[in-house]
């Protein structure tokens, strides 16, 4: 297992409320109630259970409106990452350290490169050895037992990204979708067909056209994030 990210000292608390998408009310261990920034604007299905232990980071910037940021939540003994700003940073570190063998060989890593016919930006473009690889990253927290699911709601943006990647594949360009499984208890991945059937259809169409799908497992702890390898893919 490769440690790809280390947290600064975090503050433990209990989740009391999530509201207006961007805010979480957390009771600290000393009983103080604080409002933390919620860096995940999605529905957070099943990962915002009130009364669950959480960890917050604290900004040293005195000018910041909210000092605390919600980083993770403990669900039945598994820490689940909440901060959606972290996955791309961690994947970049993984690419620099070349721990994801499935992406092949490359010399340069470019970020946020414009591409496609729908005004998109690819998260990572790997070039320099062999064919370039366009790599998109999606964070997933929803699960059914040990099965990770994406998406957790209808995502027109996610559908657009799949269409763009499919067009690349149809023109002979290598493209990949990396699902950042933001919890260590999942060993398999499946599209969330019941929540966004069109997304599942597009993902299957992409695979048929050569899209590389990488469901990458990560273990989240209050100390660090570790890469655990890839999960199996279930499409039935």
Swiss-Prot record:
Pfam families: SfsA, SfsA_N. Transmembrane segments: none annotated. Gene3D superfamilies: 2.40.50.580, 3.40.1350.60. One of its GO terms (molecular function) is DNA binding. Belongs to the SfsA family. This is Sugar fermentation stimulation protein homolog. It comes from Gloeobacter violaceus (strain ATCC 29082 / PCC 7421). The gene is sfsA.
